[in-house]
């Protein structure tokens, strides 16, 4: 299994994850599409920590994901070491920044 798990609070991924009824994030940039595909969004459940952790683990297992986003909170990313986990967190944030800028420019995405 992974040797590193990183938790970050990136502003773009966190902001976009707050969209109502959104269950996955879909990168529009080529790096995000190629390396990430769809990114699962997990609903936070502070009242039931065991269920919350189970959902995080299950989301990471889906499609062999390298990272998941907790709605309105942040990113959990995994890797064989810290650098790899950091790379996945960085790719997600870059992709969500591109998406946010495209939306602000009213580009069709």
Where are these regions (language model features)?
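Glycine-rich flexible loops
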Residues: 1-109
